[in-house]
């Protein structure tokens, strides 16, 4: 799965090694963001001497609406929640930026009293014992989640479970959302369209943009994503 990572400078080796070193193995290669796959089909056939079947589809089960806005981030989130487009996942490219936005959004009234009470009941038995725990609990009680690789796994899982129950209006996180996390996000909001790739700051690749934005409007949860 996620075969588009084959071309990644750092992670691609995990996909390249088995294909190149196990020629007698049958592979099922899947990705939602690959373009022309003729090269891979021909290469696999050369490696194992067997025909390669290509199955393609350009239809998305849940259509996406794209928009561009220059209004402040908090104002954009407030507007989307008011328009019924929550939960909103706000994509950042540093953990600090994600946490800063979560704090900023506490000034908004994103969740109703009933929704806040539901979150409070859901996390009543959760122990927020780490130094960062009380801050996370404060945000969650406002209907705001934080999600990135720097959090303890139990906190990330908690945010995912609350999101699956529809108890969070906004989630501030990094592009970890684009890596195999199945949460019912209706709207994906990019805080910016460039990121530091370890060497330089560059505009997001089309692959990264579609991988992340494609998490909006999940089948079985929404009729449309934003």
Label each residue range with its predicted role:
Residues 1-3, 174, 192:
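Walker B catalytic acidic pair
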Residues 4-9, 28-29, 65, 145-152, ...:
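Flexible beta-alpha connector loops of hexameric P-loop NTPases
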Residues 3-16, 39-40, 155, 181-184, ...:
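Conserved ATPase-coupling elements of RecA-like P-loop NTPase cores
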Residues 25-26, 183, 187-226:
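Conserved segment of the helicase C-terminal RecA-like domain
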Residues 96-170, 198-209:
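Conserved C-terminal RecA-like helicase domain
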Residues 5, 27, 88, 170-171:
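Hydrophobic/aliphatic anchor position in the core parallel beta-sheet
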Residues 17-28, 33-109, 138-149:
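Conserved interdomain linker/interface between the two RecA-like ATPase lobes of SF2 helicase motors
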Residues 2-6, 36, 179, 195, ...:
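Residues immediately C-terminal
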